[in-house]
Design a protein with these regions (language model features):
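Catalytic-core environment of secreted peptidases
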Residues: 1-72
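Short, small-residue alpha-helix embedded
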Residues: 70-84
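An often Trp-containing, charged/polar helix-loop segment at the C-terminal end
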Residues: 85-109
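Exposed low-complexity, polar/acidic, P/S/T/G-rich flexible segments that act as propeptides
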Residues: 180-224, 281-304
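Short loop/turn segments at secondary-structure transitions that flank enzyme active sites
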Residues: 31-35, 103, 191-193
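Secreted peptidase-domain scaffold signal
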Residues: 116-212
Length: 304
């Protein structure tokens, strides 16, 4: 076999050569492996492929691999999440698939995050975590919609940001003291692409609007946190410690499903229980708002 167990399949597509493009794929699923043959060089093999039912009634089973297999497994997981929690929107289902994903040890050996993400995305979804997240972790799912822009003095400017004060046990976290904990945040939303514009020269001309999230740091006050992301509040700013994030802001925001996590002490996390979701650039901002929807639905998933 060409690829080691847990590593990226030789048949996988990636965005590694794009470098500054979107994070694709967002997740990876089993797609089989390729064997080496001295005559045919590389070839698929039943022992290195998945098995599925055959469309030929004379045969009961056939080998299954590559994108067809991975897509089928991803669809299966999405269906199981929706069945387990029917009230979830498909935005949340999509978000949970990414939120539950982890890198295998082989993927981590690739090296830097900037190389792992365009090759493997956020990793392999953990089905048990995706289906039973409330039983394994403290998990919050917020489904909402945001109006990103409004017209002021003849031009469009930013409108809403959403503030979430997480209902978590602050006293319990403080009592845990120096014990290490992990908080993961995933934001899932859809955009409307600009008609006839590929967006190669300006990534903000392709999506209708972009959304972003941020978490209050332990070293800043609530006022400083809100002012840092509210450009209408003047020049008062504080620097957000970007080193605390695993993926980092610039990398995670290359897509419409963004996930990142922080590992810190429980005492530090106790004072970081506030999240904001806010709008960024998009082609709606350059159009007459009366002619566009100007509403973005999103799902925000938080787990500790």
């Amino acid at each position: 076999a060409l690829a080691a167990p847990g590593n990226l399949s030789p048949m996988s597509r990636s965005s590694w050569s794009w470098r500054n493009g979107c994070n694709k794929p967002e997740i990876v699923m089993e797609g089989g492996n390729i064997a080496y043959h001295p005559v045919f060089q590389t070839t698929t093999h039943p022992d290195l492929s998945l098995i599925t039912t055959c469309q030929d009634l004379a045969e009961s089973l056939e080998q299954f691999h590559a994108t067809s297999a991975a897509t089928a497994l991803a669809t299966r997981l999405a269906a199981k999440i929706k069945t387990a929690t029917p009230t979830l929107s498909m935005l949340s289902v999509r978000g949970m698939m990414v939120h539950s994903a982890k890198w295998t040890p082989e993927m981590i050996r690739i090296g830097n995050i900037k190389d792992i993400i365009p090759l493997c995305g956020y990793g392999v979804p953990d089905e048990e975590t995706a289906l039973f997240s409330n039983e394994k972790y403290a998990t919050f799912i917020f489904e909402n919609e945001l109006i990103p822009y409004w017209e002021k003095d003849g031009s469009n400017t930013y409108n809403q940001l959403h503030f979430y004060d997480l209902p978590w046990p602050t006293e319990v976290l403080e009592q845990m003291g120096e014990e290490n904990v992990k908080i993961r945040i995933t934001l899932s939303y859809y955009v409307k692409p600009s008609p006839g514009y590929a967006g190669r020269s300006n990534k903000y001309r392709y999506p209708s609007a972009t959304l972003h999230f941020d978490l209050k740091s332990a070293s800043e006050s609530m006022e400083e946190f809100l002012c840092r992301r509210n450009k209408s509040e003047g020049e008062k700013r504080t620097d957000n410690d970007t080193n605390r994030w695993t993926i980092k802001q610039q990398r995670r925001e290359q897509g419409t499903v963004q996930s990142d996590w922080i590992e810190c002490t429980a005492a530090e996390l106790a004072s970081c229980g506030q999240i904001i979701v806010y709008p960024g650039q998009g082609w709606w901002k350059e159009r007459k708002l009366a002619n566009v929807d100007n509403v973005i639905k999103y799902s925000l998933i938080v787990s500790i």
